[in-house]
């Protein structure tokens, strides 16, 4: 297979310093709203990169579920591999690949657990089947078969037949508090536009980076 000639030009337009808002969270909100309006598939899907205690990096796609001035919130099983990595090294990276708009956003920061109250508020908005799945799946653990997973799911359905499904004590959210956010816009002739926001003593500084 020849991969060398697979390429395309980026022609949707550039990004100028004067186009950017002073706060990167506000700027991200603008781009996210534009991605949603443009029909970008799974616009809230983001790659979460973590590093284990031994220095082994791992990546997986998770969904952005809330955004505010603290940072980027996602939810997971606290016994998962990603949670183990975060417990040993809270420094993480997020990546939003909005190919359709010739844009990408990279976030570097620290992942911190959110409160149980905030987790519960979100958990109660999830479909009942998703709540049951949180109980049924021992995330990242080896299992014998899909049949075994479905059997555990049915067992949880039988256990929680009436009323609200309680929040598992091993499931919850993290907020990634950003220290740096990069906005990338594709440009012609590979002369892409890159702007980096860095948090310096509580103030956001913006720099243009070479592509």
From Swiss-Prot:
What cofactor does this chain's UniProt record say it requires? FMN
Superkingdom, natural source? Bacteria
Biological process (GO) annotations held by this record are: pyridoxine biosynthetic process
Q: Which residues bind substrate?
A: 7-10, 65, 122, 126, 130, 190-192
Please share the entry's free-text remark on the cofactor. Binds 1 FMN per subunit.
Going by the UniProt record, its keywords in alphabetical order are: Flavoprotein, FMN, Oxidoreductase, Pyridoxine biosynthesis
Residues that bind FMN: 60-65, 75-76, 82, 104, 139-140, 184, 194
Alphabetized GO MF terms: FMN binding; pyridoxamine phosphate oxidase activity
Question: Pathway it belongs to?
Answer: Cofactor metabolism; pyridoxal 5'-phosphate salvage; pyridoxal 5'-phosphate from pyridoxamine 5'-phosphate: step 1/1; Cofactor metabolism; pyridoxal 5'-phosphate salvage; pyridoxal 5'-phosphate from pyridoxine 5'-phosphate: step 1/1
Under catalytic activity, the entry for this protein gives:
pyridoxamine 5'-phosphate + O2 + H2O = pyridoxal 5'-phosphate + H2O2 + NH4(+); pyridoxine 5'-phosphate + O2 = pyridoxal 5'-phosphate + H2O2
Q: What is its EC number?
A: 1.4.3.5
Query: Mind telling me which InterPro entries this protein's record contains?
Result: Pyridox_Oxase (IPR000659), Pyridox_Oxase_CS (IPR019740), Pyridox_Oxase_N (IPR011576), Pyridoxamine_oxidase_dimer_C (IPR019576), Split_barrel_FMN-bd (IPR012349)
Per the database entry, which stretches of residues form a coiled coil? none
Protein function: Catalyzes the oxidation of either pyridoxine 5'-phosphate (PNP) or pyridoxamine 5'-phosphate (PMP) into pyridoxal 5'-phosphate (PLP).
Q: Describe its partners and assembly state.
A: Homodimer.
**Family designation:** Belongs to the pyridoxamine 5'-phosphate oxidase family.
What is the protein's name according to its record? Answer: Pyridoxine/pyridoxamine 5'-phosphate oxidase
Lineage of source species: Bacteria, Pseudomonadati, Pseudomonadota, Gammaproteobacteria, Cellvibrionales
